[in-house]
């Protein structure tokens, strides 16, 4: 009985595995890359894709796949796309002060190593004279830096956060913890962080900043608002499509602490194109294009022994196909004549009479090759075209020359029919077409084309008052976008859309946008002065709209607000405040029977916001009987420090005295 039950369970499990529905893969959104345009246009036709289907994706200029390549394939699996179609920004050669880099590259691919060294008296981030770092998907494995050797570390001013101690100077190997205010994050992207004092400074410089999201690329056939260089956590961007296009995806995306969510949408055409045509059962078509324009016609034929019912033509109209015909099996039995004769070959006859659907095969004599299908079929009284037998004596000479490319494995004197060569393009040239060319009967099939890259011309940029938004390699691949920005003091014409600043490389040519000088309006006069602080930027009589100045407080004063003020439409933004420190009064401490709890609090200045702790002298206790000892911990507030009061134990109070200041 137990064996029966076990067998039944095994059958259930196996049947469950056999009939489990395979989960298809949805439309992939390639971060910093793209797939072929027709997938975007006919998204609903191609997706979801079935298991084991493959899809190629390409990376934008300045980005590579995780394996360091510009193009890669991903496969649909039961777990989704594998590998995940993502493109990562190449690592740029760092601007290294007090050190050197051993090679002359400007950009490094993912998984590529770079060696750097430091000058005398300076150390790498690992405390060594030389170090090797690797380009990873999120940047360098550690940021190449040469830091001066130190014996102590000074805790920097911490805005929007607090240290766990009031101590300011730390010895090597000392550690300190700090916490950031709501909405701000540590240098490591956390709410709290512990840093260590090393010989070259802090392991990670303490700071609290708002997380930022990467800039957004322009979408094809659409635009978004607002456009910024960088976005902070909480920023929302809305997408719009041009006329005759609609959004596929959410029109609103938001910057979170983990990046943008949801992914950017795409703009798809409404009516101008049709997907591949519907194919009735037992039919075939002659063309196999991926897209069809409005008004295009496709001819449909029925398979052998089937008759067409309805129009053999269907038309693309407003994004939809007209009604296709049906192919119905014919009832009439029609015989064919004897199979046709061919030179230098013969048919393999197996009957005297042949009807609809009957087939006959051919073979060639020795020394001849069969050209065409080796099989013909009787179709309603007529044979399909027979093959030809061609003498097999033609070899191919040198393969065709490809400009800016070459045969990968060297060139032979001659090539036999059926052999092939593989082409590769020169560095930065994009291969279009099949990379394989085959020798067939003395002729080569069409070779690929190597499309020229673009070289950005500095003279043209200076002439048009523009500069590159991002750092690129010396060449930009055909089809990739180059983002420009206007130089400071220049702007696009009011009638020119912002999309003109994003230019596509087209076979070595770049159409440079033109920026003109801004009108002189919105200028500011001298920036406002602040109490207990100074302006450390160089000063001028007038300031352009958008320019800024930086402030610094006097020693021991606490800077509150932004340390920079900006000129906006003729007015300065609010400058920072410099809050006064507190001075410890031993006279007040004596009056109130107080002692310092910690020796390190015996200092001339206590910064705004810092705490200082007291204890009562012997045989005294806090005057406020209902309050615990925590009242003896006081905070400096804009130069004012309140002192608690301790009274002798034999005294009694008939009333509660206020705190003295």
UniProtKB/Swiss-Prot annotation:
<keyword id="KW-0732">Signal</keyword>
<feature type="short sequence motif" description="Cell attachment site">
    <location>
        <begin position="617"/>
        <end position="619"/>
    </location>
</feature>
<feature type="disulfide bond">
    <location>
        <begin position="241"/>
        <end position="267"/>
    </location>
</feature>
<feature type="domain" description="Sushi 2">
    <location>
        <begin position="89"/>
        <end position="148"/>
    </location>
</feature>
<dbReference type="InterPro" id="IPR000436">
    <property type="entry name" value="Sushi_SCR_CCP_dom"/>
</dbReference>
<keyword id="KW-0677">Repeat</keyword>
<keyword id="KW-0225">Disease variant</keyword>
<feature type="domain" description="Sushi 6">
    <location>
        <begin position="334"/>
        <end position="391"/>
    </location>
</feature>
<feature type="disulfide bond">
    <location>
        <begin position="454"/>
        <end position="505"/>
    </location>
</feature>
<dbReference type="GO" id="GO:1990234">
    <property type="term" value="C:transferase complex"/>
</dbReference>
<feature type="domain" description="Sushi 9">
    <location>
        <begin position="522"/>
        <end position="580"/>
    </location>
</feature>
<dbReference type="GO" id="GO:0005615">
    <property type="term" value="C:extracellular space"/>
</dbReference>
<feature type="domain" description="Sushi 10">
    <location>
        <begin position="581"/>
        <end position="647"/>
    </location>
</feature>
<feature type="disulfide bond">
    <location>
        <begin position="425"/>
        <end position="450"/>
    </location>
</feature>
<feature type="disulfide bond">
    <location>
        <begin position="486"/>
        <end position="515"/>
    </location>
</feature>
<feature type="domain" description="Sushi 3">
    <location>
        <begin position="151"/>
        <end position="210"/>
    </location>
</feature>
<feature type="disulfide bond">
    <location>
        <begin position="553"/>
        <end position="578"/>
    </location>
</feature>
<protein>
    <recommendedName>
        <fullName>Coagulation factor XIII B chain</fullName>
    </recommendedName>
</protein>
<feature type="glycosylation site" description="N-linked (GlcNAc...) asparagine">
    <location>
        <position position="162"/>
    </location>
</feature>
<keyword id="KW-0356">Hemostasis</keyword>
<keyword id="KW-0325">Glycoprotein</keyword>
<feature type="disulfide bond">
    <location>
        <begin position="118"/>
        <end position="146"/>
    </location>
</feature>
<dbReference type="GO" id="GO:0072378">
    <property type="term" value="P:blood coagulation, fibrin clot formation"/>
</dbReference>
<feature type="domain" description="Sushi 5">
    <location>
        <begin position="272"/>
        <end position="329"/>
    </location>
</feature>
<feature type="disulfide bond">
    <location>
        <begin position="59"/>
        <end position="87"/>
    </location>
</feature>
<comment type="subunit">
    <text>Tetramer of two A chains (F13A1) and two B (F13B) chains.</text>
</comment>
<dbReference type="InterPro" id="IPR035976">
    <property type="entry name" value="Sushi/SCR/CCP_sf"/>
</dbReference>
<feature type="domain" description="Sushi 1">
    <location>
        <begin position="24"/>
        <end position="88"/>
    </location>
</feature>
<feature type="disulfide bond">
    <location>
        <begin position="274"/>
        <end position="316"/>
    </location>
</feature>
<feature type="signal peptide">
    <location>
        <begin position="1"/>
        <end position="20"/>
    </location>
</feature>
<dbReference type="GO" id="GO:0005576">
    <property type="term" value="C:extracellular region"/>
</dbReference>
<feature type="domain" description="Sushi 7">
    <location>
        <begin position="394"/>
        <end position="452"/>
    </location>
</feature>
<feature type="disulfide bond">
    <location>
        <begin position="396"/>
        <end position="439"/>
    </location>
</feature>
<comment type="function">
    <text>The B chain of factor XIII is not catalytically active, but is thought to stabilize the A subunits and regulate the rate of transglutaminase formation by thrombin.</text>
</comment>
<feature type="domain" description="Sushi 4">
    <location>
        <begin position="211"/>
        <end position="269"/>
    </location>
</feature>
<feature type="glycosylation site" description="N-linked (GlcNAc...) asparagine">
    <location>
        <position position="545"/>
    </location>
</feature>
<keyword id="KW-1015">Disulfide bond</keyword>
<feature type="disulfide bond">
    <location>
        <begin position="302"/>
        <end position="327"/>
    </location>
</feature>
<feature type="disulfide bond">
    <location>
        <begin position="91"/>
        <end position="135"/>
    </location>
</feature>
<feature type="disulfide bond">
    <location>
        <begin position="25"/>
        <end position="76"/>
    </location>
</feature>
<dbReference type="GO" id="GO:0007596">
    <property type="term" value="P:blood coagulation"/>
</dbReference>
<feature type="disulfide bond">
    <location>
        <begin position="336"/>
        <end position="378"/>
    </location>
</feature>
